[in-house]
Protein backbone atom coordinates (compact mmCIF):
# COMPACT_ATOMS: atom_id res chain seq x y z
CA UNK A 1 0.00 0.00 0.00
CA UNK A 2 2.74 2.48 0.86
CA UNK A 3 4.30 2.33 -2.64
CA UNK A 4 1.00 3.16 -4.34
CA UNK A 5 1.06 6.61 -5.85
CA UNK A 6 -2.72 7.15 -5.66
CA UNK A 7 -2.44 7.03 -1.88
CA UNK A 8 0.44 9.51 -1.98
CA UNK A 9 -2.19 12.18 -2.77
CA UNK A 10 -3.52 11.79 0.77
CA UNK A 11 -0.68 13.72 2.38
CA UNK A 12 0.03 12.41 5.86
CA UNK A 13 -3.26 10.62 6.38
CA UNK A 14 -2.33 6.99 7.08
CA UNK A 15 -5.69 6.23 8.73
CA UNK A 16 -7.65 7.42 5.70
CA UNK A 17 -5.26 5.60 3.34
CA UNK A 18 -5.67 2.34 5.25
CA UNK A 19 -9.46 2.67 5.40
CA UNK A 20 -9.71 3.31 1.66
CA UNK A 21 -7.20 0.57 0.85
CA UNK A 22 -9.15 -1.93 2.95
CA UNK A 23 -12.44 -0.89 1.35
CA UNK A 24 -10.99 -1.19 -2.16
CA UNK A 25 -9.64 -4.63 -1.25
CA UNK A 26 -13.14 -5.63 -0.12
CA UNK A 27 -14.53 -4.34 -3.42
CA UNK A 28 -12.07 -6.53 -5.31
CA UNK A 29 -13.10 -9.52 -3.20
CA UNK A 30 -16.75 -8.76 -3.99
CA UNK A 31 -16.02 -8.68 -7.74
CA UNK A 32 -14.15 -12.00 -7.50
CA UNK A 33 -17.00 -13.54 -5.50
CA UNK A 34 -19.62 -12.34 -7.99
CA UNK A 35 -17.57 -13.64 -10.91
CA UNK A 36 -17.04 -17.01 -9.24
CA UNK A 37 -20.71 -17.28 -8.23
CA UNK A 38 -21.92 -16.43 -11.74
CA UNK A 39 -19.55 -18.94 -13.32
CA UNK A 40 -20.71 -21.65 -10.92
CA UNK A 41 -24.37 -20.76 -11.51
CA UNK A 42 -23.92 -20.92 -15.29
CA UNK A 43 -22.26 -24.31 -14.94
CA UNK A 44 -25.22 -25.51 -12.88
CA UNK A 45 -27.77 -23.74 -15.15
CA UNK A 46 -29.08 -21.67 -12.26
CA UNK A 47 -29.57 -17.96 -11.78
CA UNK A 48 -26.57 -16.36 -10.09
CA UNK A 49 -27.08 -15.49 -6.44
CA UNK A 50 -26.26 -11.98 -5.30
CA UNK A 51 -23.29 -11.71 -3.00
CA UNK A 52 -24.07 -9.16 -0.28
CA UNK A 53 -21.85 -10.06 2.66
CA UNK A 54 -18.48 -8.81 1.41
CA UNK A 55 -17.79 -6.09 3.96
CA UNK A 56 -17.93 -3.45 1.20
CA UNK A 57 -20.30 -0.52 1.56
CA UNK A 58 -21.38 0.76 -1.85
CA UNK A 59 -22.13 4.30 -0.65
CA UNK A 60 -19.51 6.45 1.01
CA UNK A 61 -19.79 9.88 2.61
CA UNK A 62 -16.60 11.92 2.94
CA UNK A 63 -17.05 14.64 5.55
CA UNK A 64 -14.92 17.43 6.92
CA UNK A 65 -14.43 21.17 6.75
CA UNK A 66 -13.50 22.90 3.49
CA UNK A 67 -9.87 22.22 2.62
CA UNK A 68 -9.70 18.98 4.62
CA UNK A 69 -9.14 16.78 1.56
CA UNK A 70 -12.61 15.29 1.07
CA UNK A 71 -12.44 15.64 -2.72
CA UNK A 72 -8.92 14.24 -2.88
CA UNK A 73 -9.91 11.26 -0.72
CA UNK A 74 -12.96 10.59 -2.91
CA UNK A 75 -10.83 10.78 -6.07
CA UNK A 76 -8.21 8.42 -4.59
CA UNK A 77 -10.92 5.96 -3.55
CA UNK A 78 -12.44 6.10 -7.03
CA UNK A 79 -9.01 5.40 -8.54
CA UNK A 80 -8.54 2.35 -6.29
CA UNK A 81 -11.90 0.97 -7.40
CA UNK A 82 -11.18 1.30 -11.12
CA UNK A 83 -7.49 0.28 -10.90
CA UNK A 84 -6.80 -2.48 -13.44
CA UNK A 85 -3.61 -3.78 -11.83
CA UNK A 86 -4.53 -7.24 -10.51
CA UNK A 87 -1.69 -7.26 -7.97
CA UNK A 88 -1.70 -3.77 -6.45
CA UNK A 89 -4.79 -1.92 -5.23
CA UNK A 90 -4.59 1.66 -6.49
CA UNK A 91 -1.25 1.17 -8.24
CA UNK A 92 -1.20 4.68 -9.67
CA UNK A 93 0.63 3.40 -12.74
CA UNK A 94 -2.02 1.68 -14.85
CA UNK A 95 -4.02 3.56 -17.47
CA UNK A 96 -7.16 3.42 -15.29
CA UNK A 97 -5.44 4.95 -12.24
CA UNK A 98 -3.89 7.70 -14.33
CA UNK A 99 -7.22 8.48 -16.01
CA UNK A 100 -9.02 8.48 -12.65
CA UNK A 101 -6.52 10.80 -11.01
CA UNK A 102 -6.53 13.02 -14.10
CA UNK A 103 -10.32 13.30 -14.09
CA UNK A 104 -10.92 11.52 -17.40
CA UNK A 105 -11.93 7.95 -16.50
CA UNK A 106 -15.17 6.91 -18.23
CA UNK A 107 -16.51 5.11 -15.15
CA UNK A 108 -16.07 8.06 -12.79
CA UNK A 109 -18.57 10.91 -12.82
CA UNK A 110 -17.52 13.97 -10.81
CA UNK A 111 -20.40 16.36 -10.21
CA UNK A 112 -19.64 19.73 -8.60
CA UNK A 113 -22.77 21.91 -8.41
CA UNK A 114 -22.04 25.63 -8.16
CA UNK A 115 -25.35 26.73 -6.64
CA UNK A 116 -25.58 27.76 -3.00
CA UNK A 117 -28.69 25.60 -2.71
CA UNK A 118 -28.81 22.35 -4.68
CA UNK A 119 -32.28 21.41 -5.90
CA UNK A 120 -34.04 18.36 -7.24
CA UNK A 121 -32.69 18.81 -10.79
CA UNK A 122 -29.09 18.37 -9.59
CA UNK A 123 -30.14 15.36 -7.50
CA UNK A 124 -31.73 13.82 -10.60
CA UNK A 125 -28.44 14.36 -12.46
CA UNK A 126 -26.68 12.30 -9.78
CA UNK A 127 -29.38 9.61 -9.93
CA UNK A 128 -28.99 9.35 -13.72
CA UNK A 129 -25.20 9.17 -13.43
CA UNK A 130 -25.45 6.41 -10.82
CA UNK A 131 -27.77 4.32 -13.00
CA UNK A 132 -25.20 3.99 -15.80
CA UNK A 133 -23.32 0.68 -15.89
CA UNK A 134 -19.53 0.76 -15.85
CA UNK A 135 -17.98 0.70 -19.33
CA UNK A 136 -14.28 0.12 -18.65
CA UNK A 137 -14.10 -1.74 -15.35
CA UNK A 138 -16.08 -3.32 -12.55
CA UNK A 139 -17.37 -0.18 -10.81
CA UNK A 140 -19.19 3.02 -11.67
CA UNK A 141 -18.24 5.83 -9.28
CA UNK A 142 -20.17 9.06 -8.79
CA UNK A 143 -18.48 11.79 -6.76
CA UNK A 144 -21.02 14.41 -5.77
CA UNK A 145 -19.50 17.41 -4.04
CA UNK A 146 -21.24 19.91 -1.77
CA UNK A 147 -24.03 17.51 -0.82
CA UNK A 148 -24.50 19.57 2.35
CA UNK A 149 -26.16 22.17 0.12
CA UNK A 150 -28.98 19.84 -0.97
CA UNK A 151 -32.50 21.05 -0.30
CA UNK A 152 -34.69 18.68 1.69
CA UNK A 153 -36.58 17.70 -1.49
CA UNK A 154 -33.31 17.05 -3.37
CA UNK A 155 -31.92 15.00 -0.48
CA UNK A 156 -35.08 12.90 -0.37
CA UNK A 157 -34.91 12.35 -4.14
CA UNK A 158 -31.30 11.17 -3.82
CA UNK A 159 -31.76 9.05 -0.71
CA UNK A 160 -32.92 5.81 -2.36
CA UNK A 161 -30.01 5.88 -4.82
CA UNK A 162 -27.54 6.35 -1.97
CA UNK A 163 -29.14 3.65 0.19
CA UNK A 164 -29.63 1.13 -2.62
CA UNK A 165 -27.18 1.79 -5.46
CA UNK A 166 -27.13 -0.42 -8.53
CA UNK A 167 -24.92 -3.48 -8.21
CA UNK A 168 -21.75 -1.99 -9.69
CA UNK A 169 -22.09 1.64 -8.57
Question: Residue ranges of each PLM-predicted region?
Answer:
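P-loop/Walker A NTP-binding region and its immediately flanking N-terminal helices
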Residues: 1-153
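Conserved catalytic/switch belt of AAA+ P-loop NTPases
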Residues: 131, 156-169
Amino acid sequence: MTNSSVFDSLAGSKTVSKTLFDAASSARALVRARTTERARARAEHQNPAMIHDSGFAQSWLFTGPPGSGRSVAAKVFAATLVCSNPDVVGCGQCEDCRAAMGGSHPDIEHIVPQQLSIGVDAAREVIKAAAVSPVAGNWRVVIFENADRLTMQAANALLKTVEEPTEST
